[in-house]
């Protein structure tokens, strides 16, 4: 069965629109260099509005320390975290929430991430 994730949610209207059409996951980007970055307080407010929907909330992180990921996930009310950096398996294991690991399909080396202790994996096109 296919699952749909809409990432880069930055406002309540978009989040509610996703929930109303039964999107499976929505993503909040907590990487400050992203144009779709969202403040943790705004993400928390959106997640509180979504409490009566079955949609899963995902926090997207890039090379963040596990303690901060755990803190944000707990505060915001995330169901998953999605990791887009060069996290080692040891660091990934310190994260106390369901994990999605993203890897680049630029080379066969990206497949090494399948050895991580994650529930789901996703692949991205390589940045040029």
Where do the model's predicted regions map?
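Active-site-adjacent beta->alpha loops and helix N-cap segments on the catalytic face
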Residues: 34-46, 85-97, 110-111
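Short beta-strand/loop segments at the ligand-binding rim of alpha/beta enzyme cores
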Residues: 1-4, 52-59, 96-104
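Short, acidic/polar
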Residues: 9-17, 64-72, 110-117
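Conserved small/polar residues in nucleotide/adenosyl-binding loops
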Residues: 121-128
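Glycine-rich beta-to-alpha transition loops that act as phosphate-gripper elements at the mouths
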Residues: 6-11, 60-64, 84-86, 103-106
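Conserved, mostly hydrophobic/aromatic
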Residues: 18, 81
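Structural motif
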Residues: 21, 75-76
């Amino acid at each position: 069965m296919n699952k749909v994730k809409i990432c880069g949610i930055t406002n309540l209207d978009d989040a509610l629109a996703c929930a109303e059409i039964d999107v499976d996951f929505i993503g909040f980007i907590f990487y400050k260099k992203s144009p779709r970055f969202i403040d943790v307080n705004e993400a928390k407010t959106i997640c509180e509005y979504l409490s009566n929907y079955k949609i899963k909330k995902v926090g997207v992180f890039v090379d963040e320390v596990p303690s901060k990921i755990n803190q944000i996930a707990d505060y915001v009310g995330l169901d998953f975290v999605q990791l887009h950096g060069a996290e080692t398996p040891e660091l990934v294991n310190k994260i106390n929430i369901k994990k999605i690991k993203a890897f680049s399909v630029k080379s066969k080396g990206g497949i090494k991430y399948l050895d991580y202790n994650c529930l789901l994996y996703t692949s991205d096109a390589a940045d040029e």
